[in-house]
Amino acid sequence: MNTLQRRKTHQVLIDHITVGSEAPVVIQSMTNTDTADAKATALQIKELSDAGSEMVRITVNSPEAASKVAEIRRRLDDMGYATPLIGDFHFNGERLLAEFPECGKALSKYRINPGNVGKGVKGDEKFAFMIRTAAENDKAVRIGVNWGSLDQSLAKRMMDANLVSSAPKPPEEVMKEALIVSALESAEKAVLLGLPEDKIILSCKVSAVHDLIQVYRELGSRCVYPLHLGLTEAGMGSKGIVASTAALSVLLQEGIGDTIRISLTPEPGSPRTQEVVVGQEILQTMGLRSFTPMVTACPGCGRTTSTVFQELAQDVQNYLRQKMSIWRTLYPGVESLNVAVMGCVVNGPGESKLADIGISLPGTGETPVAPVYVDGERKVTLKGNNIASEFLAIVEEYVKTNYGKNSSKRNKGKVIPIQSL
């Protein structure tokens, strides 16, 4: 695992999950169901949790939504899911919390946007009510500032001051500073209102990668609160994945960031869980956490005109993901398993030996056999039409043998009984 130095922060306890400092970076997601539909929302939270989301944010934007939050919590508890719920409040959060006190109690964290709680004295009163409600209910708060909904009175104040400055900055730099000031001033107000410092998480979201990196570097240097990372809108498909990865990987490598959410625009027909998988893969490929056994596979070249190794690599990765909901409980540590599926003799044997389990499929013109390596040693050679099912059986047996309750994986060599296939 990556041993990079994490940024030192307060630690915030959100139910059973610790956020900040040396605690693992937490994966967060958000539903896109109508929160007023308690059944559909609870089922999507279950789906996101099964995929690996450790906290889930839900929209609380209307009396109908607020009235269903406690029911959503009960439904999840009845299904055996303790996933913390984050209430996403904008514009009318104080009214909803006042009218539906059970909503505030059922949530584990409130997300408050200081840019749209209201203006002037009235806005201050609304903010104060939400903060005091969180404190009374012993709930954490994320003060989430967004570029698109920045407090305009603050922005104007800072722009006016910049105009008369002896060394004026470009307007975009003033706006970035305004994001940071909004978050820090709001956190200061929250503490004065009675919310403990170890109940506060901050975020300053923008949509451009370079801006996000700049803002969070500065924000992280000026406070000791845990930070939630994510682009406001990353986009759709590969663009969204690349943008999120480019931004978050830089910050995480510098030790900045304690919770993350990948704000992907869902493609038609794609599962909501994709944002969870992308977040996990960012953390896992950086060596920060392990969630699911990883498959190493070569990209293919002229030596691998067959698609067999590509299909097998996909089958193995899908199989491992499907099994994790069961394996996570039965076989602690299995998430660190590494499997190699290689396409020819050039790098196949070497990569397969480095993995826990590896298979080197024949390339174009090579002998149609596939040697399997277990813990660096060649154990069996597969051939014929059942290579995929036979290899998956070997993986399954390896997991049971090396990660089962009666095994001691860390204290003895990995072994697997290879039967004649």
UniProtKB/Swiss-Prot annotation:
Pathway linked to the protein: Isoprenoid biosynthesis; isopentenyl diphosphate biosynthesis via DXP pathway; isopentenyl diphosphate from 1-deoxy-D-xylulose 5-phosphate: step 5/6
Keywords for the protein's UniProt record, in alphabetical order: 4Fe-4S, Iron, Iron-sulfur, Isoprene biosynthesis, Metal-binding, Oxidoreductase
Q: What class of enzyme is it?
A: oxidoreductase
Amino-acid positions noted as binding [4Fe-4S] cluster in the UniProt annotation, renumbered to this chain: 298, 301, 344, 351
Q: Look up the EC number in the record and give it.
A: 1.17.7.3
Please write the reaction equations for the catalytic activity of this protein.
Answer: (2E)-4-hydroxy-3-methylbut-2-enyl diphosphate + oxidized [flavodoxin] + H2O + 2 H(+) = 2-C-methyl-D-erythritol 2,4-cyclic diphosphate + reduced [flavodoxin]
| Cofactor dependence | [4Fe-4S] cluster
The alphabetized list of GO BP terms reads: isopentenyl diphosphate biosynthetic process, methylerythritol 4-phosphate pathway; terpenoid biosynthetic process
The record's annotation in InterPro entries points to: Dihydropteroate_synth-like_sf, IspG_bac, IspG_bac-typ, NO2/SO3_Rdtase_4Fe4S_sf
A Gene Ontology molecular function term for this protein is: iron ion binding
Write down how the cofactor binds this protein: Binds 1 [4Fe-4S] cluster.
The record's function comment reads: Converts 2C-methyl-D-erythritol 2,4-cyclodiphosphate (ME-2,4cPP) into 1-hydroxy-2-methyl-2-(E)-butenyl 4-diphosphate.
PANTHER family, per database record: 4-HYDROXY-3-METHYLBUT-2-EN-1-YL DIPHOSPHATE SYNTHASE, 4-HYDROXY-3-METHYLBUT-2-EN-1-YL DIPHOSPHATE SYNTHASE (FERREDOXIN), CHLOROPLASTIC
Q: Which family does it belong to?
A: Belongs to the IspG family.
The protein's name in its UniProt record: 4-hydroxy-3-methylbut-2-en-1-yl diphosphate synthase (flavodoxin)
Q: Which gene encodes it?
A: ispG
